[in-house]
């Protein structure tokens, strides 16, 4: 029985994680979780799973729930996330919060000796050098929840990582993959949130459309697998059936295929190196796909991906700037303050004005993050 701590329980990844826990009560127990603003959903999770500790974002929600569930310990805010992440009785932390707010709880959980299943890619983007060093010192493996990185992990099982020629991350191309740059000037939030293959949260769906999401995944792969940026390639795979591939020095490829269902990588992170069956509505049959299509990425069409590669290669605090600027720009788009077409421009503006600080400590990363957010907000 693995005792699970789940950060971001009411989001897309969190909700699907709860499905896995619900379907495997003999394998998993939810002992602590966090949620943001959806108190009705949070209340329902408490009633169903009966956790010992819960973190909410707002003080008023903590006060409300404390009166309803006197046997549960409640915390709120970032401090609450950090308390829950290190809950003594938890075995595994699955971090599914969105944004750089997930960094400190992850570092705390590593220090506390928890196994880490990481869906919060911003943690590695902003502080990969600190996180990987901390995990190494504690002899803790970070198991990826992203479908692409889970695919790479599976492709590398039993392989010598020194024999990697290239990591190939696949991308659907997002909701606007067939539109020109000129056509993007008129797109709406509603249109942007229609992903062709995956069911994801709003922020992630927009990031998929710009391909900032794939850029963050490139940086994540760099840290998780120790591969240089020049040896990480992104290709468009329209069907989202091939989740990613590894090319080896002998020219062979190992790929992981499967239905575009996030339960698969989530469950694999929780059961690694074991596997459990998953009840699908429709069985995946490879013969249903008479052809799989692969295309090179047009970096003029998707400048966000080029910005991400540049930020990763520059290193230091530049990935923090890219991530923080993108979070504010996407929030501005979702709130109607920014045109979709201008998301990349805002990020590029923030990067151009920043001089990267090499090998930053945690305080520097947090300071740069806040300064970048404040600056981009002035541009909305």
Curated annotation (Swiss-Prot):
GO terms assigned for molecular function: 1-deoxy-D-xylulose-5-phosphate reductoisomerase activity; manganese ion binding; NADPH binding
Residues annotated to bind NADPH: 10-13, 36-38, 120, 122, 201
Domain of life of the native organism: Bacteria
Pfam annotation, one family: DXPR_C
Chain positions recorded as Mn(2+) binding sites: 146, 148, 217
Keyword Lyase: no
Catalysed conversion reaction: 2-C-methyl-D-erythritol 4-phosphate + NADP(+) = 1-deoxy-D-xylulose 5-phosphate + NADPH + H(+)
EC number: 1.1.1.267
Amino-acid positions noted as binding 1-deoxy-D-xylulose 5-phosphate in the UniProt annotation, renumbered to this chain: 121, 147-148, 172, 195, 208, 213-214, 217
Cofactor(s) this protein cannot do without: Mg(2+); Mn(2+)
GO biological process: isopentenyl diphosphate biosynthetic process, methylerythritol 4-phosphate pathway involved in terpenoid biosynthetic process
Keywords: Isoprene biosynthesis, Manganese, Metal-binding, NADP, Oxidoreductase
Pathway: Isoprenoid biosynthesis; isopentenyl diphosphate biosynthesis via DXP pathway; isopentenyl diphosphate from 1-deoxy-D-xylulose 5-phosphate: step 1/6
InterPro entries: DXP_reductoisomerase, DXP_reductoisomerase_C, DXP_reductoisomerase_N, DXPR_C, DXPR_C_sf, NAD(P)-bd_dom_sf
Role played: Catalyzes the NADPH-dependent rearrangement and reduction of 1-deoxy-D-xylulose-5-phosphate (DXP) to 2-C-methyl-D-erythritol 4-phosphate (MEP).
Family: Belongs to the DXR family.
Name of the featured protein: 1-deoxy-D-xylulose 5-phosphate reductoisomerase
Species name: Listeria innocua serovar 6a (strain ATCC BAA-680 / CLIP 11262)
Gene name, Swiss-Prot/TrEMBL: dxr
């Amino acid at each position: 029985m693995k005792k699970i701590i789940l950060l971001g329980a009411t989001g897309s990844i969190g909700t699907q994680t709860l499905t896995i826990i619900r379907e495997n009560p003999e394998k998993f127990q939810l002992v602590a979780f966090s949620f943001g603003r959806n108190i009705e959903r949070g209340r329902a999770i408490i009633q169903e799973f009966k956790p010992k500790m819960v973190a909410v974002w707002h003080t008023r929600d903590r006060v409300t729930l404390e009166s309803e569930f006197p046997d549960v310990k409640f915390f709120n805010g970032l401090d609450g996330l950090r308390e829950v992440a290190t809950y003594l009785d938890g075995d595994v932390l699955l971090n599914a919060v969105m944004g750089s707010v997930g960094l400190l709880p992850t570092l705390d959980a590593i220090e506390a000796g928890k196994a880490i299943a990481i869906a919060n890619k911003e943690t590695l983007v902003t502080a990969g050098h600190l996180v990987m060093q901390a995990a190494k010192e504690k002899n803790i493996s970070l198991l990826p929840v992203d479908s692409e990185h889970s695919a790479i992990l599976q492709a590398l099982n039993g392989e010598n990582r020194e024999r990697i020629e290239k990591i190939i991350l696949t991308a659907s191309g997002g909701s606007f993959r067939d539109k020109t740059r000129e056509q993007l000037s008129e797109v709406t939030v509603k249109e942007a949130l229609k992903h062709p293959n995956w069911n994801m949260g709003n922020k992630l769906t927009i990031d998929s459309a710009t391909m900032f999401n794939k850029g963050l995944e490139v940086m994540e792969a760099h840290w998780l697998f120790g591969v240089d940026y020049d040896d990480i390639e992104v290709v468009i795979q329209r069907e989202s059936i091939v989740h990613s591939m590894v090319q080896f020095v002998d020219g062979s490829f190992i790929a992981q295929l499967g239905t575009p269902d996030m339960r698969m990588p989530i469950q694999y992170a929780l059961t690694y190196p074991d596997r459990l069956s998953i009840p699908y509505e429709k069985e995946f049959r490879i013969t249903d796909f008479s052809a799989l299509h692969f295309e090179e990425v047009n970096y003029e069409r998707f400048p966000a991906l080029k910005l991400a590669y540049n930020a990763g290669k520059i290193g230091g605090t530049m990935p923090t700037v890219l991530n923080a600027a993108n979070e504010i720009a996407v929030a501005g788009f979702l709130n109607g303050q920014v045109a979709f077409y201008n998301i990349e421009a805002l990020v590029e503006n923030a990067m151009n004005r920043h001089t990267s600080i090499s090998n930053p400590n945690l305080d520097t990363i947090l300071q740069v993050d806040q300064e970048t957010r404040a600056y981009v907000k002035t541009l909305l």
